[in-house]
From Swiss-Prot:
SUPFAM superfamilies: alpha/beta-Hydrolases (SSF53474)
Organism, scientific name: Bacillus subtilis (strain 168)
GO annotation, biological process: proteolysis
Official protein name in the record: Uncharacterized peptidase YtmA
GO MF entries: serine-type endopeptidase activity
Active-site positions on this chain: 122 (charge relay system), 236 (charge relay system)
Family per record: Belongs to the peptidase S9B family.
Superkingdom per UniProt: Bacteria
EC number from the UniProt entry: 3.4.21.-
UniProtKB keywords: Hydrolase, Protease, Serine protease
Length: 257
């Protein structure tokens, strides 16, 4: 439910931008909405950002990139960010911010209700997994780009994030295993009904490609539709030209689903 909608300066004449304040489990959470300026009915695109706090913040240029392909895009900032209420979590209670954002797109007058896609980058990958599980057949597709799928693996791989993870999650995977398991929903992947696309650079050192391998394997075991675009020379951040090309390709992939 939208509490407030304010115009935000857009560098593109083809896309209108708004900052949105919406309700998520009673909290006022902020996000960025992009609408194509041309009137019409569009697919919805839930953009789930990476990072935490000021790292990996939602960038208007990135949102416009996707909206320009013919989508109404909504990107939640997550609770505790940019004036939003509550404390930021890490694929914990903040999953509700993604669920509520999906429902917000369902209620948008210019969005085709049965054509809402989930996109997650980096930390947004696990947020997308959780949302695809929660929404089941309501989601048209799910794309994870350099996405996290396993929080214990993230803790092991990213020594630089351990302090933050212990603070936000409440301890180490050994101390609070149930908290990490709750945030790593492999046991519920059977509830995903949307076709899945996994995009990953094999040289990614922020989120190792192991995360995509694990999710791919799980989906295949369950005979779920999954496609993979793995790039042997790319890291977590793809070169700009390739990035733009893949944006066009993945949005076309979504529309074909």
């Amino acid at each position: 439910m939208i509490v407030e909608k304010r115009r935000f300066p857009s560098p593109s004449q083809h896309v209108r931008l708004y900052t949105i304040c919406y309700l998520s489990n009673g909290l006022r959470v902020k996000g960025l909405l992009a609408e194509p300026a041309e009137p019409g009915q569009y697919d919805g695109f839930l953009y789930l950002r990476g990072g935490i706090k000021s790292v990996g913040m939602v960038r208007p240029g990135r949102i416009i990139q996707f909206a320009s392909q013919g989508f109404v895009v909504f990107a939640p900032f997550y609770r505790g960010n940019q004036g939003g209420e509550g404390n930021e979590d890490f694929a914990g209670e903040d999953r509700e911010d993604a669920f509520s954002a999906f429902r917000l797109l369902q209620q948008h007058p210019n969005v085709k209700k049965d054509r809402i896609h989930i996109f997650g980058f980096s930390r947004g990958g696990i947020m997308g997994m959780l949302t695809a599980i929660e929404m089941g057949g309501q989601a048209a597709s799910f794309v994870s780009w350099g996405g996290v799928s396993d929080m214990i693996l993230t803790y092991e791989e990213r020594q630089d994030l351990r302090r933050m993870m212990k603070r936000v999650i409440g301890g180490t995977p050994k101390k609070v295993p149930e908290e990490y398991q709750w945030r790593t929903p492999f046991d519920q992947v059977n509830k995903i009904q949307a076709p899945v696309l996994l995009i990953h650079g094999e040289k990614d050192q922020n989120v190792s490609i192991q995360h995509s391998y694990l999710l791919e394997e799980k989906l295949k075991q369950l005979h779920k539709p999954v496609e993979t675009w793995y790039y042997s020379t790319f890291t977590h951040y793809f070169p700009p030209k390739e990035n733009r090309r893949i944006v066009r390709q993945l949005t076309q992939w979504m529309k074909n689903r």
